[in-house]
Amino acid sequence: MKNFNLTHRIVMAPMARMRSYGNIPQPHVALYYCQRTTPGGLLISEATGVSETAMAYQNMPGIWRKEQIEAWKPIVDAVHSHGGIFFCQLWHAGRVSHQDCQPNGESPVSSTDKPFADDPSNEFTPPRRLRTDEIPTIINDFRLAARNATEAGFDGVEIHGAHGYLIDQFMKDSVNDRTDSYGGSLENRCRFALQVIEAVSKEIGPDRVGIRLSPFADYMESGDTDPKRLGLYMAKSLNRFEILYCHMIEPRMKTVSEIFECRESLTPMRNAFNGTFIVAGGYTREDGNKAVAEGRTDLVAYGRLFLANPDLPKRFELNAPLNK
């Protein structure tokens, strides 16, 4: 994977833990990640907020303050001491938030001011639509967070552009109802995502940057009427920045909890993207191996299986029984 010498194709997928009290990662996190580290293995951190307005859930980690950077350092060092390659997932929740999680109790920001249609428990506060002149500030938050991640020792960053969070809220036409240069056409809807990629790549170098996308998913009421076109456009557009990898969620994962029968495939996106391609979404040992053997991906990310089996690469190697 360019400058990174991987010893296997199994990636630890990003998984939120919500144990970073005060948005500061705690010392015990080092054990959690080290248990899942192998020499030459790639791990992607839990979603990490790029700013105070990026937050959505209680006790999620951030990386916009000095004390957060300092708290991450021994955790990253511990992973490196076990030979792991560690990327920080940079995240902004957008409208998937409540005012209690926002500074001064303000409304969360988004590409839109549309509230969730299905929110019977009022879990989410109706969002405030970002003004066009505010968007560069959010882009800069991602840039600074990437700089902070490298200061903390991370090998690189993954931009969270999936699962209905802010970047996805701009890309998906079921959410984005803007009439400015960030809404309407596919090119306009993807503009924000690509500007974030450009800013982060210029800050830390494209060889240290990846992005996670879920064009086919309809999570957090963020679906698209033409997900294949969206995925292909993004895969092709990323090439001009020469970033390290593109991490895509399988079409069968319309939500984060169910696997659906699906005829769609990520193969067109895999063929369109020039860098390392990572797939995720309901993979087993067998179909992960098959996907690699058939050239449909370079790497396979596992979430739940890695959570239940910290030694997942060894179990896969031995074809040993797995905890569920």
From Swiss-Prot:
Residues 99-128 are annotated as: Disordered. Gene3D superfamilies: Aldolase class I (3.20.20.70). Putative oxophytodienoate reductase that may be involved in the biosynthesis or metabolism of oxylipin signaling molecules. Its EC number is 1.3.1.-. The active site is at Y165 (proton donor). Residues 99-113 have a biased composition (Polar residues). The keyword Oxidoreductase applies. Belongs to the NADH:flavin oxidoreductase/NADH oxidase family. FMN binds at P14, M15, A16, A47, Q89, R212, G282, G303, R304. GO terms for molecular function: FMN binding; oxidoreductase activity. The lineage of its organism: Eukaryota, Viridiplantae, Streptophyta, Embryophyta, Tracheophyta. This is Putative 12-oxophytodienoate reductase-like protein 1. Keywords: Acetylation, Flavoprotein, FMN, NADP, Oxidoreductase. It is an enzyme of class 1 (oxidoreductase).
